Each structure stands twice: as structure tokens, then as C-alpha cells.
Amino acid sequence: MLELLVSASLTVNSDRPGKLKPSRADADVWTLSDREGITTSARSVSQLFARPCPRVPPGQPPSAMAAYSQTQYSAGIQQATPYTAYPPPAQAYGIPSYSIKTEDSLNHSPGQSGFLSYGSSFSTPASGQSPYTYQMHGTAGIYQGANGLTNAAGFGTVHQDYPSYPGFPQSQYSQYYSSSYNPPYVPASSICPSPLSTSTYVLQEASHNIPSQSSESLGGEYNTHNGPSTPAKEGDTDRPPRASDGKLRGRSKRSSDPSPAGDNEIERVFVWDLDETIIIFHSLLTGTFASRYGKDTTASVRIGLMMEEMIFNLADTHLFFNDLEDCDQIHVDDVSSDDNGQDLSTYNFSADGFHSSAPGANLCLGSGVHGGVDWMRKLAFRYRRVKEMYNTYKNNVGGLIGAPKRETWLQLRAELEALTDLWLTHSLKALNLINSRPNCVNVLVTTTQLIPALAKVLLYGLGSVFPIENIYSATKTGKESCFERIMQRFGRKAVYIVIGDGVEEEQGAKKHNMPFWRISCHADLEALRHALELEYL
């Protein structure tokens, strides 16, 4: 009879848990005990009903309630012992350390949103190398303590600006680079109009970049290089001097190094042919250009002959072509190692006995090694003077040839542009685009002898885009050999693009896996300029 009453009472109370009251249950049980005389088992039944009750008696303080999002454990499950908290390793740049999700965290209460949640603001501003504060899953104490993570409320009240994060001084890394190190980053002012609040690297312009100078200021200097190559670092001064053609030279007695600095920092090298690519010259003399484009053949030949006369007149009068015709060099610095640095301001080239000291017609064999040390020094003097004249008058050839010839030259240039439909103008647009880039360079390889090639460059107004160090003559060795020297000079990391109209440069480019851009008409020049403007090349 007792068992039936107890089970009936359990059934009724389980169906209506909200109506369960401990005082009424106790009264029913004590009434039952009065009738049957059982008291001990009735107290255990009262405890059984009172244990799963979720309600809190009125007298119990609110602190006895479980904290929000705190893990609840059933009566039969023992709470797992918290794992030992280990401090995170030192973070080099303020990256927060992440804890591993443990097995007991899988039994989280439904009120917890996930493994990692964020608060309304950082409890304390991040300082030094400290990791940021996050609220981890399980706030009962498993992930607290030495791990540096604190409970924070959600984002949204205090906006943390990026400048509040600490900057990292670069002084601690001074042992890894010299004081002259210039990080190759773009200045912040050129990227956005408003100044950035964070610390940024600013590329400071090197003090030894040669600005645009007047032609008179470069008259007495030997080491004058206005090319687009990158300035050298201070640490490079102790290295062996490297000639501008890419070959290592022994130390001469000159105080200045003729080689342009920073050749191995060039990223892209444009190797140009001269005749029928940049300028129209040979096809004027033969009449090929006039017949192809329907021009006056007589006028074409006349203009070609007049330009040829001016070229050789300039070469003979100012560039020692009479002395150097049989001693032609591939590059202007090929004999610079024989120069002792003597002052040439009062040197008399016509009376130094250059011809008489070199017997026979074959003054030069190979690359010019003949005639003894004294004769080689006089040869080097002439090439040094040629270099000085080129650098002085490359933007003012009219001042070199004189006023009467200057007028003739200007008239001839105008007629040439009209006959060739502005061929040279289109070429100069592409050349100037390349020349304006900081890490790109124009290099000229021509089958003309070096001295007449320099005269052509000056008379056609190309001196500003071709430094004399970037001009090579392939008369003796061929263009493929010149390509190898150029690659040795600028390094294998640079990208080489060959631009020309002939088979020789195309085959040389193919052998060295260089892209080749053929120039055969005005449309090719326009397409090249368009590709450069869009930075496809």
C-alpha cells in the first residue's frame, strides 16, 4: 500500500513540476507516516523531491545562483579538474596567443556563444609586446590566470584607433644594416592625400643623384653620368671598380670611377638598335624609305647625304675620328684602365705624337692593345675627352658645332621629320617613357663604329635618353657579343627587351631568351609607346 501511494505521488508531481511545493509534499508524507508508522523513509523521499527543483527558496541569497555562461554539471558528473594554465611564449609583434580547446569545454552551457568571443572594449590598452585581451570559452577559471586573457564585455563602446598600438623602433636592428640604408618603399605622401597616422618608411632622395645641369657645368668632369641607374650605397666604395661596360677593372690612378653606380639594381633593360629603328638614315641614302612610303626619292637621298656629311664632320672635328677610326672600341671605357688621370685642360692632342709613336697602318689589334704603354695612355686620353664632350653637349649639340652649322642642322632636322612622318618624334616618346622610370634603362647597340654612332646620337637629339656608358658598337664583335656584355653588366635578374628591325638582333635576342619587339613601320612605334604607357613592358 505504501509503494502504491509513493509512486502515485511521484507520477502526479512529475507531470506538474511547476506546481510542486516542498511544504505540501512534506505534509502529505507526514500524514502517511502517522498512519503507517514509517518516518525515516519519508525524509529520504522529501530530499528526493527537493533536489531536482530548479526554483530557489525565498530565503536563499542571489549569489547562490550559477553565474551566467558558467558550466553546469549534473549530480552524477564530477567537474573536471582545471588544466594547468601555462603562460604564452613571448610574442614578437603583439600577436595574441591562442589556447587549445579542451575536452571539457565541449560540455558548455547553451548560453555561451562559442569558443572565442570578443568584448566591448579592451580592459586595458595593449602596451609593449603584451598580447591582446580576449574572452575565452569557459569563464569558470579554466583559461584564466597566467595566460594573460581577461574577461571583457563586447566591442562597441570605446573605439580603439590604430595609432594606439605600439610602434617598433628600428634602432634595435641597426647591427644588420648600415646607416645609409634606404628602404625601397614609396613615400606615404605619394599614395594618399592625407597623412598616415602610423609610422611609415619614407624613401629619401639620395644626395648624390645628379640633377639637371647646364652643359657648361659638366665640362671638366670625367665621371659624369646622368643615366637612370640607381645610386650606389656607401658600403660599395671599398669594392673593386667596375667599368660601365660590366668588366672588372684594376685600380687606376684616377680618383673617379667611370662606371655608373647601381647597375645590378636595374630591373628592366631595353636594348635598342639605332638605324631604321630609332632613326631613319641608311634607307634615306639608298632611297628605300622613299619608294616604300611613296616619298620623293631625290629629296630623300639629298637629306641623307647632308646628314651623313654632318655626322662625319662632327666626328672628325670634335670626337677624334681621324685618330680613332682604326682604333675603334666597343665601349667608351674599354681603354680607361690605361688612363692615369692627367689633367687634359691644357693637353695638346695634335702635338702629342700619337700617330708617330704607332708605326704601321694597323694601329690597333683586337680591342686596341698595340703600341706600348705610352701610346695606350694617349689613346685613353682621347676616349676620355670624347666622353667629356658627349656629356657636355648631349643636350646642346648646336653649341658644339657652332652657330652657322646649327641653323643648317635645325633646317635639316625639320626636313627629315617631314619626310619620315615624324618617325624620330614617335621613337623619342617611347624612349622618354622608359627613361622616366626609376629602375629601367635604355641601351643602344649599333653596327656603326663607336665614334660615328656617338655623332649620330648627338645630331639626332638622343643624348638625353642614352648616356654614353649605355652605347655599344657591334662593328667588330657582332650584336650577340654585345648582348652578353650587357647581361654581364646588369645581371641575370634584370629583364631584357630587344627592340630592332634586323635579323641579327632578333637572333641574338632569341639565343638569350630575350623578348624581341620588331620595328618596321610607324604603327610598330605607336604600339610600343602604347604598351609602355599601359606598363605592359
Curated annotation (Swiss-Prot):
List of catalytic residues: 273, 275
Obligatory cofactor(s): Mg(2+)
Binding-site list for Mg(2+): 273, 275, 501
Name of the encoding gene: EYA2
Protein name: Protein phosphatase EYA2
Reported function: Functions both as protein phosphatase and as transcriptional coactivator for SIX1, and probably also for SIX2, SIX4 and SIX5. Tyrosine phosphatase that dephosphorylates 'Tyr-142' of histone H2AX (H2AXY142ph) and promotes efficient DNA repair via the recruitment of DNA repair complexes containing MDC1. 'Tyr-142' phosphorylation of histone H2AX plays a central role in DNA repair and acts as a mark that distinguishes between apoptotic and repair responses to genotoxic stress. Its function as histone phosphatase may contribute to its function in transcription regulation during organogenesis.
EC assignment: 3.1.3.48
Top-level division of the source organism's lineage: Eukaryota
Region of interest (Disordered), residue spans: 210-262
Family: Belongs to the HAD-like hydrolase superfamily. EYA family.
BP-aspect Gene Ontology terms: cell differentiation; DNA repair; negative regulation of extrinsic apoptotic signaling pathway in absence of ligand; positive regulation of DNA repair
Location relative to the cell: Cytoplasm; Nucleus
Chief subcellular location: cytoplasm
Pfam families associated with the record: Hydrolase (PF00702)
Presence of keyword Nucleus: yes
Keywords: Activator, Chromatin regulator, Cytoplasm, Developmental protein, DNA damage, DNA repair, Hydrolase, Magnesium, Metal-binding, Nucleus, Protein phosphatase, Transcription, Transcription regulation
Polar residues biased stretches: 210-229
Complex and partners: Interacts with DACH2 and SIX1, and probably with SIX2, SIX4 and SIX5. Interacts with CAPN8. Interacts with GNAZ and GNAI2; this precludes interaction with SIX1.
Lineage, uppermost ranks: Eukaryota, Metazoa, Chordata, Craniata, Vertebrata
Top-level EC class: hydrolase
GO molecular function, one term: magnesium ion binding
UniProt entry tagged with the keyword Translocase: no
